[in-house]
Swiss-Prot record:
Lineage: superkingdom: Bacteria
Record's protein name: Glutamate--cysteine ligase
Lineage: Bacteria, Pseudomonadati, Pseudomonadota, Betaproteobacteria, Burkholderiales
Catalytically driven reaction(s): L-cysteine + L-glutamate + ATP = gamma-L-glutamyl-L-cysteine + ADP + phosphate + H(+)
Family of this protein: Belongs to the glutamate--cysteine ligase type 1 family. Type 1 subfamily.
Keywords noted in UniProt: ATP-binding, Glutathione biosynthesis, Ligase, Nucleotide-binding
InterPro entries assigned: Gln_synth/guanido_kin_cat_dom, Glu_cys_ligase, Glut_cys_ligase
Gene Ontology biological process terms, A to Z: glutathione biosynthetic process
Organism, scientific name: Bordetella bronchiseptica (strain ATCC BAA-588 / NCTC 13252 / RB50) (Alcaligenes bronchisepticus)
């Protein structure tokens, strides 16, 4: 008998208390800039500890690209409270610098002078550094300075037992459920870009003289008039190796099999570069992907890994643990880069994706229609009369958006039922207004501020970042919280030193071991 979305919602309603065990966490990126809004060329601040081993503050691509990481939380208020505290601690350490509160970068130095993140001399640290050298060779450093907010989300196993009762084991129920969620996310994530995309403009110099289709807003600012998120668009940058990847979200095994092919298949252009230059490692290998994380996507199935364990192997052996939503822009109007309203809507949206009917994708498991809808919304989502493709039928953004909000509303209500209050319903109601009035979207508000203030993207962003810094510094952390962050920083330095002193093999051998740790997730297909 077919299990319908209505039946799953009914079962979910009877077990709504399990929603109190939803876990969510945030990784928020932000460039360090100097007082003029220029990318900081300083080393990672000592007061923030070792980027390799500090669980609260690390770096992403560049030495200047901070990444602030929360733990997992069972409610949004405590989640954002921790993120706010981490920002406050960081601002207590930074001297003469700000966190750039925009997804599109600040003023960047010449490409060659953008500093790649450094993690010390341990094999673990060097692996991370060389991987980033490879990204520079493949995509350029400028693109790697784009920042975002990653939202990690998991439902308790007991809830997957309710939603996916026909799978044979808890691991199978969980993995099947998350992959089903990802298919629906792929179908409907255009809505997140319309509602929360905050990157319609950028600094002209970001394009580095490349050809583009952007328009001029002022001498130093480029934009698209109806764009929601240039960060999630191609921006005129095409990567042939990744553009041919069509990963399948119909089942975990096929997804992992195709990802395995990408991290083991040589790519001629990368073979021409090689892995060393002047005796120095410049990329980990010459394959389509150096490692799994190089694959760019708006959502990922995730599983915590052990040291030297490969993500493919962890997912194949222990299944999906949570999903990582990667398409959220930094909210420039919020000091922490994401609001409670946004987080609550994303919760309800993801629960809707997990529970709704999620048919398999045709065409070998890749949905070109969904990719096209996403691409058009990030470039012209607010364009009057814009039509999207829903199963072969043209539908307007407001019509489809309102219909989706109608479908998401019962899941927002379930979170309110479980947690008390009406905060989830209020978050959903705020999104309806954006569909009716595109001028209320973050992307429209950013462009309005630039036009009305007759100000460049750079000056507007620097002013906002300064004001957020002032607001955060005006609320210093309690002494015991400051002490806890400082102690974590000290311990991270000691842990990095321990790793450097405990390496038993040279780096070449370590890289070989790391590649050898990758297991074919579909051994029956191995030749």
């Amino acid at each position: 008998m077919t299990d319908t979305a209505a039946q799953r919602h009914h079962r979910l309603q009877a077990h709504a208390d399990l929603l109190t065990q939803t876990l969510r966490g945030i990784e928020k990126e932000g460039l360090r800039v100097d007082h003029q809004g220029v990318l900081a060329r300083t080393a990672h601040p000592a007061g923030l500890g070792a980027a390799l081993t500090n669980a609260h503050v690390t770096t992403d691509y560049s030495e200047a690209l901070l990444e602030l990481i929360t733990g997992t939380h069972t409610d949004v208020d405590s989640l954002l409270g921790e993120l706010r505290d981490t920002h406050r601690y960081v601002y207590g350490v930074l001297e003469g610098e700000y966190i750039w509160n925009q997804s599109m970068p600040a003023t960047l130095p010449p490409e060659a002078d953008i500093p790649i993140a450094w993690y010390g001399t341990s094999n673990t640290g060097m692996l991370k550094h060389v991987y980033r050298r490879g990204l520079a060779e493949r995509y350029g450093k400028t693109m790697q300075c784009i920042a975002g907010v990653h939202y990690n989300f998991s439902l308790p196993d007991a809830l997957w037992d309710v939603l996916v009762p026909d799978a044979p084991t808890p691991q199978a129920r969980r993995s099947r459920g998350y992959i089903s969620l990802i298919r629906n996310f792929t179908r409907y994530s255009w809505l997140l870009m319309y509602l929360f995309g905050s990157a319609p403009a950028l600094a002209r110099e970001f394009m580095r003289g490349r050809d583009h289709l952007l328009e001029t807003l002022d001498p130093s600012t480029l934009y698209l008039p109806y764009a929601t998120s240039l960060r999630m668009s191609d921006l005129g940058y095409q990567n042939k190796a990744q553009s041919r990847l069509k990963l399948c979200y119909n089942d975990l095994d096929t997804f992992l099999g195709r990802l395995y092919e990408a991290v083991t298949e040589p790519w001629p252009a990368y073979q021409a570069i090689g892995t060393r230059r002047d005796g120095q490692w410049i990329q980990l290998n010459t394959n389509v992907l150096q490692i799994e994380n190089e694959y760019y996507s708006s959502i990922r199935p995730k599983r915590a890994t052990g040291r030297c364990e490969r993500p493919i192997t962890a997912l194949a052996e222990r299944g999906v643990q949570y999903v990582e939503v990667r398409c959220l822009d930094i909210d420039p109007l919020t000091p922490e880069g994401i609001s409670a309203e946004t987080a609550r809507f994303v919760d309800a949206f993801l629960l809707f994706c997990a529970t709704s009917d999620s048919p398999f994708f045709p065409d070998n498991g890749y949905c070109q229609r969904s990719a096209d809808n996403f691409a058009v919304v990030v470039k012209e989502g607010r364009k009057p009369g814009l039509m999207l493709d829903r199963e072969g039928q043209a539908v307007s953004v407001p019509q489809w958006g309102h219909e989706l909000l109608d479908q998401i509303a019962p899941y927002a209500a379930l979170y309110d039922q479980a947690l008390g209050g009406d905060a989830y319903a209020a978050a959903l109601a705020a999104q309806r207004a954006k569909l009716d009035q595109p001028d209320l979207t973050p992307s429209a508000r950013v462009l309005a501020a630039l036009r009305e203030g007759n100000v460049s993207f750079h000056d507007y962003s620097l002013d906002l970042s300064r004001r957020h810094a002032d607001a955060l510094r005006a609320q210093p952390l309690p002494a015991e919280r400051t002490q806890a962050y400082a102690e974590a920083a000290r311990q991270s330095v000691a842990e990095q030193l321990r790793l450097e002193q405990s390496d038993a093999v040279d780096f070449d051998t370590y890289v070989a071991h790391y590649h050898a740790a990758l297991k074919n997730p579909l051994p029956s297909t191995a030749s």
